[in-house]
Amino acid sequence: MGNCLHPAELSPSTQNSSQLNSDLWNFSYDGNDSFPDVDYDANLEAAAPCHSCNLLDDSALPFFILVSVLGILASGTVLFMFFRPLFHWQLCPGWPVLAQLAVGSALFSIVVPILAPGLGNTRSSALCSLGYCVWYGSAFAQALLLGCHASLGPKLGAGQVPGLTLGLSVGLWGVAALLTLPITLASGASGGLCTPAYSMELKALQATHAVACLAVFVLLPLGLFGAKGLKKALGMGPGPWMNILWAWFIFWWPHGVVLGLDFLVRSKLLLLSTCLAQQALDLLLNLAEALAILHCVATPLLLALFCHQATRTLLPSLPLPEGWSSHLDTLGSES
């Protein structure tokens, strides 16, 4: 296969066929008629398929494994801190929702090796579909949880609005599961690699998945920023609660944008005139995917930083929950 940089060479059979056609042409038209010269080499170069180098190929396996291990360790540490008895992170506003963010990050970290290239050709389509389901399901759930945490803020405290956290959790994870159905049905194993399937029969599923990613990863954070700015401009209150956790969308926003562009190109709704443009889009797809994968390491760090800042501010002014005062008195008497 050739590409825009290295054209495909003719095989011997193709060369013989071309020579035969040329001989027949010269034999049939041996008169004084003149015909325009045609640059067959230039036409061949233009017709050669455009080929892009995949950054996330077998050589990227160490990257997948390292990110998976670090993500599992970091998410597990954060979950331990959240559920550790009498630990001050439980005073963090909306900590049950934040703990679910760590769960989503851990789930993503676990399935990263399943979708990683270079682990052999033994993976089945069912395993790949499950991997994509958890991959995108955890990401969708984290984005929706962040949106609710930003919108409701301190109201998500477990003791302030009974049942709100549980109801939101079930609803948001359910919505995330529904949003993963298109990519789950439109993915499988090809040549031993887990990959989304692109075909006319699956075009509706591909379009639905692209729209879901665009809505959750791109439009949701833009909507939060817009609501924040609009409420502030109109003096209608503080608006969505802006904090360091919003940096999570930096890891998935490019993925949503580039995935939408790729779907438009595959559907021929957006035409790329040059091979270089197609190669640039493929490169952006790889970079956006790598950035999205890194979120499973960054999310626990963002959670730790947020809870550290929140508890440092709130701890002196908040009344201690039942059981904390006796625990602190015991520590004071021992000292």
UniProtKB/Swiss-Prot annotation:
Transmembrane segments: 63-83, 95-115, 129-152, 166-186, 207-227, 244-264, 287-307
Organism: Macaca mulatta
Assembly, per entry: (Microbial infection) Interacts (via N-terminal extracellular domain) with Plasmodium knowlesi Duffy receptor alpha form (DBPalpha) (via region II).
Source organism superkingdom: Eukaryota
Listed name of the protein: Atypical chemokine receptor 1
Keywords: Disulfide bond, Endosome, G-protein coupled receptor, Glycoprotein, Membrane, Receptor, Transducer, Transmembrane, Transmembrane helix
Stretches in topological domain Extracellular: 1-62, 116-128, 187-206, 265-286
UniProt keyword annotation of NAD present: no
Function summary: Atypical chemokine receptor that controls chemokine levels and localization via high-affinity chemokine binding that is uncoupled from classic ligand-driven signal transduction cascades, resulting instead in chemokine sequestration, degradation, or transcytosis. Also known as interceptor (internalizing receptor) or chemokine-scavenging receptor or chemokine decoy receptor. Has a promiscuous chemokine-binding profile, interacting with inflammatory chemokines of both the CXC and the CC subfamilies but not with homeostatic chemokines.
